């Protein structure tokens, strides 16, 4: 094109430019303007979308005359004092006197589970009830969280408060009778020191438009291929020459009249070139374009200068050949210089082509003029030619002519092979000149018609090239998009009907193992009773009938410019992502930038480096020291020192070179701007980074990541490169990818994670590496329900099992057939692993779906050591599975296992009444699957069975109407789009701040003495379900166990180490009113929801409850109760959540302080048995207190006066 432009300029200066020159320049300018318009389409910005502003209703405090004004009764006289007012000293005096009267009242005897006889009461007629509370103080001043009161005064909460505040008339105490006091478990309330939450909404969330790095499709950079001489014989040449002279061309034996319209546009110039299927016939992208007949006469001086330039070029080519021989590098283009000589010689001798005219002298470089739609200049005469695949710029070029072994690359063999090839009957690989009226009639859209399961559909994709194509002379000329051009040259268009054979049943002819001619059965060529392939004319009687599914052949139309890279699931099979700049497409926008290297700052940046076409840099910076780094530096030095050859590669070749570990070739391909994220169906959507990780090449992984490879790309099995490194046991590659940001918790299609594979192969360092990130779930289950510890048990990796147990692996999780890891350990016969699991409190009597215990499996497999271990740990050999077999029935007679089971049976009969008891599991899950984790029940103290005198529930229930305000429109909610970690979260503001850290634990500064109210995000919030402010509503996450204590009946203990601030469980039971609590007989499970007098509500876990009903009192508690609101915000009905107040060891009993109000009533019947040094309610502590009071009784002057008592903090 540059030569054509120079010749045109010279002719115009002399005033002798022919008419064709003016048309040439005009057409070039028109095409350049069209290309600029198309190029600018990719840079058109998107319209910015913003979401409407959503502002919640602000909190309006209730006015003085509001009907929801809350008053709290202080004292026994029923005087109402507004909330927040400080009670008078006189009221406190009356309260103290009232408490003193209770000790002498008549007490109704309840059925407390943990009871001991006490001294007889002093008489009286006032019944009492024991209720647990949130604090240890007998009474606390009426205080409440100021923000919560504003919530209560909202219009939605007013009705519920008014409706629920009326006490039932049936339970009203008559006048003159003292108020009934009940012993309740209570908790402390937040004081007035908690600052009110400002009534404001979070600021408007700014929606920033993410600027996509859009790379529009670049113009095609390669020129038309150099013509090659046909050595198929003189007959063919003479025939074509005569056809050219006569102006008529006959391609088939059909009617030549169908070519009349085309011949009118084409003119006299016509040449036909047939391209072989070898890789070596691709043409260099820097080959010079030819412009024929720009002028008929040139001066002799110009011809002499042209001959001198040709001689200089020949000398340069000879120098390049010598350099190639010295370097010894073998490439696909080793015979390129020889072929260039042959082409030049042929170009001079051939009578078909007029001699080309070059510029007189070389001019300084100018700005490139815009090319036509097809990437070549619009000048020159129109010709009908079949061009090589390389010049068509097709994305599937590499699949048409692969480089097969044994194919010679030198020119002589190519000419010999070309001589034996026959001219095909079809014209699938021929290009006709541009016909403007055809493209304009089609609206510059693709004219292809696809045949899909017998149905026809058209393609409306935009075209890049206006040259026309057709499969045969029986089909009209049409302009095609790049996708259908690629399929046309692959002979996938039927020559009979002109439809593309996309999906359905077709015939395929294979004249060569590399080529498949596809056509319809009804479109075969018939002659003298024989059928022939309409493509090649071969006998079609042996053509294969193939059925192509819809997913394989249907390819979406290729657009001219893509706004953003498509997702991986929508990639066209076997095609590169053309929306990004590649080796043969240049984007008009900003080039892609590789991700920054996080290790670059820690390693010396000195060393060789290469700059990629996309702006990235290849260097050894960030690569750990070792052989891999040395090899990479050596490869970079070689690329810097040697003269780089201009080669052409298919994107799929990068994967193959990476798989073979060819570092030099990989760098060369990356320098040719091959896409490091290219995925093909032939490799199951695997990227080159997958292949590098599979091979274990750290240096290739390094250069691919520097070139912009996606470290978390997934293949068809959803496997990432990090998973490939773990599966293939490449520790260094895995460590490097973890440091570079590889996702360690992603899951495959079957649910397996990297930790599953590491545990399966037994690489302890790999497991330690993954666990050290803190991002993997040690109890993750795959599609079969198997956890990493189950895989390790099955493959006998005992050290991996020990490490997983130290990191919190749950040995009670079951797979899809309800097997636990102990079942798999017994299946493999590893007694050592089984003992480790049993020491980790694994259930020896667990049964799977078939009713088999680990003993059944070990006996069936005849593993003697496992059977002895299970029998020594108390396994019951008399248990039967679902088929009615015991372990003894499954054992071969007279075997070692059979004798062991027989001996154990006799020993069990002999020691049936032994004095020492061993702890045994009497229930595998008291929650019956209602909790996230199973809660087993064990008893090693007596023969008491698992308690069944209650109904296990996981949430509070009601047996009467409570009028709880659950209206979703009354909920205060946040509009966060993140994980609610910012200070703008409204739910966090309601709680003063969000009190949870990233692990869902309470912060260190949380007030454990007077816990504030916590408002978690609810169903009205805009945040995700897994946001940071949703802890209690996620349920129990720690492993607990119900066990029989020696002195306090049933208790609850931890089966794992629990850090401080961790959510344990919720106190769940039946919601009842205070009046209802006064008439209930058993008050051992009452928990007061508020710490003030008046109409309050309680939770009774006597008949309905969860595991928390078994938590005992501890004077030195390790858990604390906190009021939490989730599904509603009715302040009368908070939910009681228990959090750990300190670190809890494995096997330690859980307990909280019931409160002094509880022990004021219950201390007359039993005393505390916690055994703590700080115990305040044991028999010894009570005796010491009574002795102290007795000594002070004769000296009343030593007692402090009420007026001198310090005021109670509010």
From Swiss-Prot:
The UniProt record lists the keyword Transit peptide: no
ANK repeat positions: 649-678, 684-713, 717-746, 750-780, 784-813, 817-846, 850-879
Annotated Pfam families: Ank, Ank_2, EHMT1-2_CRR, Pre-SET, SET
Major location category of this protein: nucleus
Name of the protein: Histone-lysine N-methyltransferase EHMT2
Taxonomy of the source species: Eukaryota, Metazoa, Chordata, Craniata, Vertebrata
Cystine connections: none
UniProt: Zn(2+) 2 binding residues: 974, 987, 1017, 1021
Modified residues (Phosphothreonine): 44, 555, 1210
PTM section of the record: Methylated at Lys-185; automethylated.
Organism: Homo sapiens
GO biological process: behavioral response to cocaine; cellular response to cocaine; cellular response to starvation; DNA methylation-dependent constitutive heterochromatin formation; epigenetic regulation of gene expression; fertilization; negative regulation of autophagosome assembly; negative regulation of gene expression via chromosomal CpG island methylation
UniProt keyword list: Acetylation, ANK repeat, Chromatin regulator, Chromosome, Isopeptide bond, Metal-binding, Methylation, Methyltransferase, Nucleus, Phosphoprotein, Repeat, S-adenosyl-L-methionine, Transferase, Ubl conjugation, Zinc
Residue ranges with Acidic residues bias: 298-327
């Amino acid at each position: 094109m540059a030569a054509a432009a120079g010749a045109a300029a010279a002719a115009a200066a002399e005033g002798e430019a022919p008419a064709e020159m003016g048309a040439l320049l005009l057409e070039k300018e028109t095409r350049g303007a069209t290309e600029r318009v198309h190029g600018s389409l990719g840079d058109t910005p998107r319209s910015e979308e913003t979401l409407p502003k959503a502002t919640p209703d602000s909190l309006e405090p209730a006015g003085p005359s509001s009907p929801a004004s809350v008053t709290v009764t202080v004292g026994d006289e029923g005087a109402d004092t507004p909330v927040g007012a400080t009670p008078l000293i006189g009221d406190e005096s009356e309260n103290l006197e009232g408490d003193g009267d209770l000790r002498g009242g008549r007490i109704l005897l309840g059925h407390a589970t943990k009871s001991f006889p006490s001294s007889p009461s002093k008489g009286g007629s006032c019944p009492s009830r024991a209720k647990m509370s949130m604090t240890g103080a007998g009474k606390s001043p009426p205080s409440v969280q100021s923000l919560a009161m504003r919530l209560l005064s909202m219009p939605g909460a007013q009705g519920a408060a008014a409706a629920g505040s009326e006490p039932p008339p049936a339970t009203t105490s008559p006048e003159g009778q003292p108020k009934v006091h009940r012993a309740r478990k209570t908790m402390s309330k937040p004081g007035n020191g908690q600052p009110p939450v400002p009534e404001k909404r979070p600021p408007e969330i700014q929606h920033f438009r993410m600027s996509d790095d859009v790379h529009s499709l670049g113009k095609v950079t390669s020129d038309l291929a150099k013509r090659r001489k046909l050595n198929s014989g003189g007959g063919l040449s003479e025939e074509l020459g005569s056809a050219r002279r006569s102006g008529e061309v006959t391609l088939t034996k059909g009617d030549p009249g169908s070519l009349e319209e085309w011949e009118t546009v084409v003119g006299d110039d016509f040449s036909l070139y047939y391209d072989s299927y070898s890789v070596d016939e691709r043409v260099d992208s820097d080959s010079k374009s030819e412009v024929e007949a720009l002028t008929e006469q040139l001066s002799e001086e110009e011809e002499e200068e042209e001959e001198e330039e040709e001689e200089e070029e020949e000398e340069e080519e000879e120098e390049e050949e010598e350099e190639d021989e010295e370097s010894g590098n073998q490439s696909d283009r080793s015979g390129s210089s020889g072929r260039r000589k042959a082409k030049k010689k042929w170009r001079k001798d051939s009578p078909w082509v007029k001699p080309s005219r070059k510029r007189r002298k070389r001019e300084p470089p100018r700005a490139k003029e815009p090319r036509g739609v097809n990437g070549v200049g619009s000048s020159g005469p129109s010709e009908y030619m079949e061009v090589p695949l390389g010049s068509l710029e097709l994305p599937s070029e590499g699949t048409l002519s692969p480089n097969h072994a044994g194919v010679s690359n030198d020119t002589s063999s190519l000419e010999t092979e070309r001589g034996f090839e026959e001219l095909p009957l079809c014209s699938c690989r021929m290009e006709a000149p541009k016909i403007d009226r055809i493209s304009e009639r089609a609206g510059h859209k693709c004219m292809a018609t696809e045949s899909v399961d017998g149905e026809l559909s058209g393609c409306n994709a935009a075209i890049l090239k206006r040259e026309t194509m057709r499969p045969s002379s029986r089909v009209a000329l049409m302009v095609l998009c790049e996708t259908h051009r690629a399929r046309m040259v692959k002979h996938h268009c039927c020559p009979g009907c002109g439809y593309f054979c996309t999906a359905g049943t077709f015939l395929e002819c294979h004249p060569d193992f590399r080529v498949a001619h596809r056509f319809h059965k009804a479109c075969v060529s018939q002659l003298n009773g024989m059928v022939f392939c309409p493509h090649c004319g071969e006998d079609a009687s042996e053509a294969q009938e193939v059925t192509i599914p819809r997913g394989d052949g249907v390819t979406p139309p290729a657009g001219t410019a893509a706004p953003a890279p498509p997702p991986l699931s929508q990639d066209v099979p076997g095609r590169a992502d053309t929306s990004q700049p590649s080796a043969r497409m240049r984007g008009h926008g900003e080039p892609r930038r590789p991700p920054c290297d996080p290790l670059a700052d820690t390693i010396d940046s000195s060393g060789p480096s290469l700059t990629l076409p996309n702006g990235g840099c290849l260097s050894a910076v960030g690569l750990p020291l070792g052989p891999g780094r040395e090899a990479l530096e050596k490869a970079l030095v070689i690329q810097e020192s040697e003269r780089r050859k201009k080669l052409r590669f298919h994107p799929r070749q990068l994967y193959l070179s990476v798989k073979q570990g060819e570092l030099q070739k990989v760098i060369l391909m990356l320098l040719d701007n091959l896409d490091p994220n290219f995925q093909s169906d032939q490799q199951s959507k695997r990227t080159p980074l997958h292949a590098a990780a599979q091979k274990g090449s750290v240096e290739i992984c390094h250069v691919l990541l520097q070139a912009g490879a996606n470290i978390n790309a997934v293949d068809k099995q959803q496997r990432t490169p990090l998973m490939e490194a773990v599966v293939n046991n490449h520790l260094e590659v895995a460590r490097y990818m973890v440091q570079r940001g590889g996702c360690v918790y992603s899951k495959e299609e079957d649910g397996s994670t990297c930790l599953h594979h590491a545990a399966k192969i037994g690489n302890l360092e790999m497991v330690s590496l993954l666990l050290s990130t803190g991002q993997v779930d040690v109890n993750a289950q795959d599609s079969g329900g198997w956890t990493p510890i189950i895989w390790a048990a099955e493959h006998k990796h005992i050290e991996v099992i020990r490490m997983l147990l130290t990191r919190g692996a749950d040995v009670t999780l079951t797979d899809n057939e309800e097997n636990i890891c102990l079942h798999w350990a017994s299946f493999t016969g590893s007694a050592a692993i089984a003992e480790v699991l049993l020491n980790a409190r694994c259930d020896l009597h667990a049964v799977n779906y078939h009713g088999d215990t680990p003993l059944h499996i070990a006996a069936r497999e005849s593993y003697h050591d496992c059977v002895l271990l299970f029998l020594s740990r108390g396994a019951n050999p008399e248990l039967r599975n679902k088929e009615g077999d015991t372990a003894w029935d499954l054992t071969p007679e007279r075997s070692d296992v059979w004798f062991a089971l027989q001996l154990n049976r006799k020993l069990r009969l002999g020691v049936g009444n032994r004095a020492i008891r061993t702890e045994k599991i009497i229930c595998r899950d008291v929650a019956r699957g209602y909790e996230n984790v199973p809660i087993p029940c064990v008893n090693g103290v007596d023969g008491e069975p698992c308690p069944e005198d209650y109904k296990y529930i996981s949430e509070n229930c009601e047996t009467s109407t409570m009028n709880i305000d659950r209206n979703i429109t009354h909920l205060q909610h946040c509009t966060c789009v993140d994980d609610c970690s910012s200070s703008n979260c409204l739910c966090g503001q309601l709680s003063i701040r969000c009190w949870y850290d990233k692990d869902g634990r309470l912060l260190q500064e949380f007030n454990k003495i007077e816990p504030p109210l916590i408002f978690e995000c609810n169903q009205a919030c805009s945040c995700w379900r897994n946001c940071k402010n949703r802890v209690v509503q996620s349920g129990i996450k720690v492993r607990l166990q119900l066990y029989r204590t020696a002195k306090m009946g049933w208790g609850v203990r931890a089966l794992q180490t629990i850090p401080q601030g961790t959510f344990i469980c919720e106190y769940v039971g039946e919601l009842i009113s205070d009046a209802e609590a006064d008439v209930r007989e058993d008050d051992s499970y009452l928990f007061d929801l508020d710490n003030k007098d008046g109409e309050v509500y309680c939770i009774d876990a006597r008949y309905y409850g969860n595991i928390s009903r078994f938590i005992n009192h501890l004077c030195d508690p390790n858990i604390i109760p906190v009021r939490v609101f989730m599904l509603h915000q009715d302040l009368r009905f908070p939910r009681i959540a228990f959090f750990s107040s300190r670190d809890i060891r494995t096997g330690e009993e859980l307990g909280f302080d019931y409160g002094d109000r509880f022990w004021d009533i219950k201390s007359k019947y039993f005393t505390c048995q916690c055994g703590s040094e700080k115990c305040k309610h044991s028999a010894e502590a009570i005796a010491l207190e009574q002795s102290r009071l007795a000594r002070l009784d004769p000296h009343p002057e030593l007692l402090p006066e009420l007026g001198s008592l310090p005021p109670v903090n509010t």
